Amino acid sequence: MLRQFGPTPEYQWPTPIEDIDGVADADRFHCEPVPAAGFGNHLPTDVAETVGENTDVVVRFGFGVLKGEFLEMPTHGVLSFHRGDLESYRGQPGGLWEFLNDEPTAGVTLQRIDDDLDAGEIVVEDEVDIADAHTWREIERRQIEACVEMLAAGIERLRDPDHESTPPDSLGSLYTIPSGTDVLRYVGKTAVGRVRSRYAERDAPETRRTRQPSE
């Protein structure tokens, strides 16, 4: 309901693994997550042992909450992105509540996860300017863009023997999918934001490329 009807934005288009330099020939293990007690998932034992014992670091994407001994098997653990400042905005959807609350910035966190929700060590954290973002989708795009450089920075930090990652000082409120009046707020802000975005594009000064004088 919150995704807004329309085509999938370009920043969410999937990229086939075989098209990515450096990992096209990587081994792939297809598996079904094993439900953990309470909440979250485990990796199947055989996959956990094979990957964990032969990997320097794992990056979790689209696997839900991952728990269990596997988190400590890779040399540098398991990393996960959180689109939000863990001391202010936890839960989901990332960036949505910052949009509804008219925040000027939104956080992005790369964390080494453990069994406690959102309590793992922070490897890299950053914030993006969203003061002029007219829709949640625009906030989401900016947060995802920030993740690219953060992953490279995080790997470099993990390779640095002098770097010490630390857990968050405190954890903020846990947000969930909005309902009731919050959905109406979202619809209203999105409608207004789209209109403002169109006017901003129309009023933007036209830029022209000029030839620099030769020396």
Where are these regions (language model features)?
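One-carbon transfer enzymes
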Residues: 1-215
